[in-house]
Amino acid sequence: MTDHTPLQPKHEITDQADQDTSAEMLVEEEDKKEIGPNYITEEEAQEIRLRALAEMENFKKRLQKDHDEQIRYAIDNLLTDMLPVLDSLDLAIQYGSNDDACKDILMGVSMTRKLFLDTLKQYGVTVLGEINEPFNPELHEAIAHEEREDIPEGHVSTLHQRGYQLYERLLRPAKVSVSSNKNNSNTNK
């Protein structure tokens, strides 16, 4: 038998095994000291899990809301580009109403305008700006003040250009003149 390992006394082997075991125990104790306070309880783990699930659910809802809003307002730019066409129809009706020769054409333009407005309404567009309605700076753009006895102060006295709104989003404010009473103007001067 040729064994190249040197022979060691038995007591040396057990001393070395004891040293290895005690070294492992020291390392485990060190690990426990480092990791021990960082352990979480089952209740804490459940709470963390529930919070993560709630955050994920809120994130999904935000994504869905953003997606729905993008779809809802996808026609925003198209509608804004179409508003001058509607303005032209309004002007044709306004100026054609004074000429009897344009009566038949005026009827066709009026029908086209109504059809156009009905279609816009189906897509969530509302028309803004009526004479005698209260002035609202969020929906109206005041371009002048007029002294008017027949319209209450702070109300729309003249409509220069209609405004339009897509659901809650303003496409264009109505351009209006706002009434002011003659009596109030003189007392303020």
UniProtKB/Swiss-Prot annotation:
Oligomeric and partner information? Homodimer.
Q: Recorded GO terms, molecular function?
A: adenyl-nucleotide exchange factor activity; protein homodimerization activity; protein-folding chaperone binding; unfolded protein binding
Residue ranges, annotated region (Disordered): 1-23
Keyword field: Chaperone, Cytoplasm, Stress response
| Listed name of the protein | Protein GrpE
Q: Which organism is it from?
A: Lawsonia intracellularis (strain PHE/MN1-00)
The GO annotation for biological process reads:
protein folding
Family in the record: Belongs to the GrpE family.
Show the GO cellular component annotation of the record.
Answer: cytoplasm
Give its localization: Cytoplasm
